[in-house]
């Protein structure tokens, strides 16, 4: 009998949610997603010290003469993300998602500028933009930035997405892909209700993604739906049939080991017959987020968490740069 992972792969594009190259080699997904936390975790792995060093050296060669250490570190953060993305693309056949600095989440212009830079860094390695998804937090400013980028042919993945309003606003902006979070929605409801278990289709994260998926298919939106942030296998199984699911290696391993019959839960032909065409202007979007305590809190928490991960990555790079300088001094003596 086929494994659950094999069956899932026949109805959904399985994506690896990791920056760990060995895990990606092991599971051979079509696509892969990264975020600041995953890049930080990979950067801490001693196996990838050489990759970090190459990113630092590349940054030194990229910057004009007279650059400061701060400028070098900021440049290296971008290059580290691209270096990992480049190595991932050697393994997979599809796309890699590379995230814009989360600290720019409320700045449309800066987000557009950073995304263009990341695409150019990939281009310098001979990697075309068609293989890259630029990840941007689904704030109003982030969605507007993605709308601009999409018109330039730069495909985007809108992340930290927690409600229907965010999803529909992305679809109306013709964004390539959205990543509605499942597990973080579950976390919030557990904390607020005191209920320790939400089974299968009762899981609030599953309910959210199912609603978004069905509405998109009914309205004919081209925006792909990629469920993300899972806490257990049941959540993944309940979304079998979704366009894509990005799954952490530990769950990929469990799905690979498990046998049994996987039932398709989502299908493009399954519709909810909702005749309303939802459109959210900026004031509507902001009010919707304000009224949705879960989405508002989780979006804020996600941006804060990813921002802290970038700051920690910057500290790690400062330490590594110091080690490299000391090594050069010792070698010179």
Swiss-Prot record:
Chief localization: cytoplasm
Reactions catalysed according to its record: D-sedoheptulose 7-phosphate + D-glyceraldehyde 3-phosphate = D-erythrose 4-phosphate + beta-D-fructose 6-phosphate
Any one GO BP annotation for this protein: pentose-phosphate shunt
Top-rank taxon, per record: Bacteria
Record-linked Gene3D superfamilies: Aldolase class I
Subcellular localization: Cytoplasm
SUPFAM superfamilies documented for this protein: Aldolase (SSF51569)
Keyword Transcription regulation annotated: no
Keywords: Cytoplasm, Pentose shunt, Schiff base, Transferase
Pathway info: Carbohydrate degradation; pentose phosphate pathway; D-glyceraldehyde 3-phosphate and beta-D-fructose 6-phosphate from D-ribose 5-phosphate and D-xylulose 5-phosphate (non-oxidative stage): step 2/3
Pfam families assigned: TAL_FSA
EC main group: transferase
Signal peptide extent: none
GO CC annotation, single: cytoplasm
A GO molecular-function descriptor: transaldolase activity
HAMAP family registered for this protein in UniProt: Transaldolase_1
Subunit structure: Homodimer.
Membership in a protein family: Belongs to the transaldolase family. Type 1 subfamily.
Function: Transaldolase is important for the balance of metabolites in the pentose-phosphate pathway.
NCBIfam families: talAB
Protein name per the record: Transaldolase
Gene of this entry: tal
């Amino acid at each position: 009998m086929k494994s659950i992972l094999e069956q899932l792969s026949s109805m959904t594009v399985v994506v690896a949610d990791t920056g760990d190259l060995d895990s990606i080699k092991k599971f051979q997904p079509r696509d892969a997603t990264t975020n600041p936390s995953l890049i930080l975790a990979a950067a801490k792995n001693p196996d990838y010290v050489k990759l970090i060093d190459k990113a630092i050296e590349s940054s030194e060669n990229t910057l004009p003469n007279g650059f400061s250490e701060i400028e070098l570190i900021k440049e290296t953060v971008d290059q580290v993300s691209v270096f990992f993305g480049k190595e991932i693309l050697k393994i997979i056949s599809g796309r890699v998602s590379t995230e814009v600095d989360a600290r720019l989440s409320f700045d449309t212009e800066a987000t557009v500028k950073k995304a263009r830079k990341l695409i150019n860094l990939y281009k310098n390695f001979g990697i075309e933009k068609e293989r890259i998804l630029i990840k941007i937090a689904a704030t109003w400013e982030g969605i507007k930035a993605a709308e601009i980028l999409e018109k330039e042919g730069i495909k985007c993945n809108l992340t930290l997405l927690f409600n229907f309003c965010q999803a529909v606003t992305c679809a109306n902006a013709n964004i390539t892909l959205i990543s509605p979070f499942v597990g973080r929605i579950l976390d919030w409801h557990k904390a607020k209700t005191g209920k320790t278990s939400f089974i299968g289709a009762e899981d609030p994260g599953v309910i959210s993604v199912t609603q978004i998926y069905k509405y998109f298919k009914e309205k004919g939106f081209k925006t792909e739906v990629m469920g993300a942030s899972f806490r257990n296998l049941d959540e993944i199984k309940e979304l079998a049939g979704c366009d894509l699911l990005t799954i952490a290696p530990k769950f990929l391993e469990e799905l690979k080991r498990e046998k049994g019959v996987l039932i398709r839960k989502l299908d493009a032909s399954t519709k909810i017959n909702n005749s309303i065409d939802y459109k959210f202007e900026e004031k509507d979007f902001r009010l919707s987020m304000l009224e949705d305590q879960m989405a508002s809190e989780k979006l804020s928490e996600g941006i804060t968490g990813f921002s802290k991960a970038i700051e920690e990555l910057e500290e790690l790079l400062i330490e590594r740069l110091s080690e490299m300088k000391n090594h050069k001094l010792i070698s010179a003596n």
